[in-house]
């Protein structure tokens, strides 16, 4: 199904349902439109790569509603990124977090040295916040690139 919706409570619930069901939605952020899905759903992640014809070596970012979600996702921001994040997020800043062993995101990448990392974004957009909060199990995932 493909449809353009105005943002209201009904469309937010619909987007959350699509994401929870493993589907994709296109959402606005403070900088670009992104393709969103559940970042724990490997099939949905695969679909983003397929739809965008994006090579698998290009990592995906996770869109968060709040910086304090990092710990619950099994992610840590090393110093000095934690201080920069406190100063510049929400906003157009995308730090790379370190994924702990308890991180279950399907979007985690490994460096050549084997360190597991994950790019994050906390957009400065009330609309994006409403969309990401509507999916309460886990915030939406976005690629940060045009579809």
Residue ranges and their predicted role:
Residues 1-145:
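Active-site-adjacent structural elements in enzyme catalytic cores
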């Amino acid at each position: 199904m493909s449809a353009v919706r105005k943002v209201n409570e009904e469309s937010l619930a619909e987007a959350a349902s699509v994401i929870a069901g493993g589907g994709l939605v296109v959402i606005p952020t403070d900088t670009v439109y992104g393709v969103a899905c559940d970042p724990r759903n490997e099939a949905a992640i695969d679909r983003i790569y397929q739809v965008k014809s994006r090579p698998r070596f290009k990592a995906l970012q996770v869109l968060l509603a709040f910086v304090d979600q990092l710990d619950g996702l099994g992610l840590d921001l090393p110093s000095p990124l934690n201080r920069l994040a406190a100063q510049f997020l929400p906003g157009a800043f995308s730090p790379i977090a370190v994924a702990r062993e308890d991180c279950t995101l399907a979007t985690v990448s490994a460096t050549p040295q084997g360190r597991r990392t994950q790019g994050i974004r906390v957009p400065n957009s009330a609309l994006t916040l409403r969309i990401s909060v509507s999916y309460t199990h886990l915030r939406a995932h976005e690629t940060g690139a045009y579809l």
